[in-house]
Amino acid sequence: MKKLVDRVTYSLLNEAPIALGLPTLYRDYCRVCGSPSRRGRPWKLARGLVESWQIDSRWQRMIERREGLRCGECGSVSRFRYLARVVMDELGAPDPGYGSFADYANSEDFRRLRVAEVNGCGALHKYLDLNPELAYSEYGSEDPAVPSEDLTRLSYGDSEFDLVLTSDTLEHVPDLAGALGEIERILKPGGRHIFTVPAIWDGRMTRRRAVLDGDRIVHLYPPSYHGVWEDRSPDRLVFLEFGDDALDYLRTPGTDIRVRRHPGNPAISVFIAVKAGGPDEAGAG
């Protein structure tokens, strides 16, 4: 009964205000660090990005909450808190002993997994780093301690990882099919690629904004950049804007893919691609 009351309270005081663009009132615990600290303000989308994305005020508010409402303790934004929740659910860690991702990351259940974090997952990174065999990389890294990995040409071996994590990266990759094929290749049978990309679920279809022709970028629409609008570095350029048909673009022949949307904010979506050949599949039928 207490769980039901908490859930109804959370929906009324947190999820409903988010959907309506109102302040949140409920002091909820953070799925990343477990802290009950209050949330910060929504992030503010640049006017140029709002215009290039062609989103209405409702979707603007939801995306601003996706990228904001920072935890006062660990600094995680809404996107990473929901990613943490989905990772725990997918890896079979809803045990009451794992109240947060920080708890789970300290467990033997997590430490025995082979994990690749391709580009940092925000506040999740310091907990992922508790895994002694974490393969962490940043595209274009100049830090000798942090390797650079190109998602279309990963250096890892076949069937190496139980879990691959990417967050808001694939929309910036010119060769999406190549990147997804590489991720599928390095996953073990039954392994999971759990990831986020911005997707607008308002009836629009996925739009390709740019293509790569040899070494030359051809813009099909005016260039659009995520993050700080004024920072027009090449790795922030948007090649794909995902819409209602996002799963069709993110599916590969060897994976089963689905999406989980935050119940109070559909702008917060987490995708789960499971490589075929896992133990559950082998035992089916």
What kind of feature is each model-predicted range?
Residues D162-P174:
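A short SAM/SAH-binding and catalytic strip from SAM-dependent methyltransferases
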Residues L151-V164:
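A short acidic, Gly/Pro-enriched loop at the edge of an enzyme's catalytic core
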Residues N106-R153, W201:
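Class I SAM-dependent methyltransferase SAM/SAH-binding core
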Residues K3, N14-D28, V32-S35, A177-A284:
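S-adenosyl-L-methionine-dependent methyltransferase catalytic module, highlighting the catalytic core
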Residues S35-S37, S76-R79, G120-H125, G140-E142, ...:
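Short, solvent-exposed loop/turn segments at secondary-structure junctions
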Residues S155-G157, P174, G243:
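GHKL-family ATP-binding catalytic core of two-component histidine kinases
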Residues L12-N106:
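N-terminal juxtadomain amphipathic helix
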Residues R41-L45, R85, D129-L130, R204-R209:
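Short aromatic-enriched loop/helix-cap "lid" or pocket-rim segments at secondary-structure transitions
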